[in-house]
């Protein structure tokens, strides 16, 4: 099983250990594309601060994120599982999982990123600010920048098992599974049952809980149909729609009755 996650916008502080080594990250086929974004991002943020803030879509209160990006090559790196914070990652609570569940997380979780493309939880990265919606002056829109290298690398990473896609729209646009990989993919929405609407905070929290449940129990569905049954067994209310045509993902709605 491969689980595709969005990053968090806010991040924990960089570590005090060794700095980033791009060549040591998972999915080495993305190295050149990573280094291209990294180089331009550092250069942008080392220049005119107001321009960098505008390009990155940062408010006045997030001005300090520009300076943080200038230190990406020298800041101490930490495992991505410690860098990403926020609602989804708080609900996942990776640090509190037992050793076996952490090993499953290391194998199966892939976090998408405007800067790194995609990283595993054990990949050591510095704290950064660069969303997939950013359009860098030289490289252009990052979503478009990542499509070709992702298309080369990720089908192999997906293997022959289930792909559980929990990404938000901007990150989903960077790689869309195709063909037989798409047929093994399930996308998930979390809906407030009375209104049938997505509530952002609870959507993220529920997705984090779903991933935690799968990891903690060692549940490894072989495909989308098995995922539906597994989630129901774990206590989730799930509505599923199989694709009308082959080579397309399944669509799953997880219904929640209390928003908290």
UniProtKB/Swiss-Prot annotation:
InterPro entries, per the entry: YaaA
Domain of life: Bacteria
GO biological process: response to hydroperoxide
GO cellular component terms, A-Z: cytosol
Family according to the record: Belongs to the UPF0246 family.
UniProt-recorded name of the protein: UPF0246 protein SCO2297
Species: Streptomyces coelicolor (strain ATCC BAA-471 / A3(2) / M145)
Phylogenetic placement of the source organism: Bacteria, Bacillati, Actinomycetota, Actinomycetes, Kitasatosporales
């Amino acid at each position: 099983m491969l689980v595709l996650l969005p990053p968090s916008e806010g991040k924990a502080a960089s570590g005090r250990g060794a700095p980033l080594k791009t060549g040591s990250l998972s999915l080495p086929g993305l190295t050149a594309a990573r280094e291209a974004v990294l180089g331009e991002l550092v250069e942008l943020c080392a220049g005119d601060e107001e321009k960098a803030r505008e390009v990155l879509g940062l408010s006045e209160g997030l001005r300090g994120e520009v300076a943080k990006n200038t230190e990406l090559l020298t800041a101490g790196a930490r495992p991505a599982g410690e860098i990403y914070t926020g609602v989804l990652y708080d609900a996942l609570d990776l640090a509190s999982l037992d050793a076996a569940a952490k090993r499953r997380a290391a194998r199966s979780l892939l976090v998408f990123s405007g800067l790194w493309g995609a990283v595993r939880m054990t990949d050591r990265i510095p704290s950064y600010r660069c969303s997939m919606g950013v359009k860098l002056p030289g490289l252009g829109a990052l979503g478009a920048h990542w499509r070709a290298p992702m298309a080369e690398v990720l089908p192999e990473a997906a293997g022959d098992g289930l792909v559980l896609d929990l990404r938000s729209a901007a990150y989903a646009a960077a790689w869309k599974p195709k063909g037989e990989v798409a047929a093994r993919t399930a996308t998930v929405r979390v809906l407030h049952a009375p209104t049938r609407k997505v509530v952002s905070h609870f959507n993220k929290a529920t997705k984090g809980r779903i991933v935690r449940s799968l990891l903690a129990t060692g549940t490894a569905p072989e495909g989308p149909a098995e995922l539906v049954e597994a989630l129901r067994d774990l206590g989730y209310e799930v509505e599923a729609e199989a694709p009308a045509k082959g080579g397309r993902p399944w669509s799953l709605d997880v219904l929640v009755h209390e928003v908290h």
